[in-house]
A protein has these predicted regions:
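Conserved N-terminal beta1-alpha1 strand-loop-helix module at the mouth
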Residues: 1-208
Length: 208
């Protein structure tokens, strides 16, 4: 079954909403974003998070020591990297913490995919390319990019997903997980009904 990640939680109210519907992962954004949270805010939310849900920290070119510290303190269970982090950065992070690493890339063309795959990361995440934006654009990812590519590593798909399109995205690709943020918000706030519907839509999909 395709996994679900709800990204960009910012409050205990958001945690209460996801706890009711149990996505597989949630995301705390530590990068410059309207969804940014501090270390202490993330720790407080993680303490309230259902233990069946994995907390992922989202970073853009963050000093390795800070990321490793959040892993060691139990603030996050996995790391998602959206910057230009090198293979040696990922290798050292994994050696120091034993954490799962998701490497996000923004792809414009199918021929770019093979050379952008990280050998060190556990998973890839493909997101919509938008100049100057490392992620979280809410714009639809062009599925032909992954459909035309041979991706050996399990991957997350992000970019413009919502309950209206996620089932077709899953059927058309071999994604390991789908990642949503804007698609489960109303006026910039996580919407419980949209979260419920999104999780339900994903878990009702039957791949051929």
């Amino acid at each position: 079954m395709t996994k679900v990640k709800i990204c960009g939680l910012r409050s205990l109210a958001d945690v209460e909403k996801v706890n009711r519907y149990l996505p597989d992962y949630i995301g705390f954004v530590f990068a410059d974003s309207r969804r940014f949270v501090t270390d202490e805010q993330a720790l407080e939310m993680n303490r309230a998070l259902d233990r069946r849900i994995q907390a992922v920290g989202v970073f853009v070119d963050e000093p390795l020591g800070h990321v490793a510290g959040l892993c060691d303190r139990g603030v996050i269970n996995a790391v998602q990297l959206h910057g230009g982090e090198s293979e040696s950065y990922i290798r050292e992070l994994k050696q120091n913490t034993g954490t799962t690493v998701i490497k996000a890339v923004r792809v414009q063309r199918a021929e770019q995919v093979s050379r952008m795959i990280s050998q060190e990361a556990d998973y890839m995440l493909f997101d919509t390319y938008k100049k100057g934006a490392p992620g979280g654009t809410g714009e639809r990812f062009p599925l032909e990019i992954v459909k035309e590519s041979f991706v050996r590593k399990p991957y997350f798909l992000a970019g413009g997903l919502d309950c209206g399109n996620v089932a077709e995205v899953i059927r058309q690709t071999e994604c390991f997980a789908v990642d949503v943020s804007t698609g489960v918000e109303t006026d910039g706030v996580k919407d419980e009904e949209k979260i419920r519907r999104f999780v339900e839509c994903v878990r009702n999909v039957k791949r051929v």
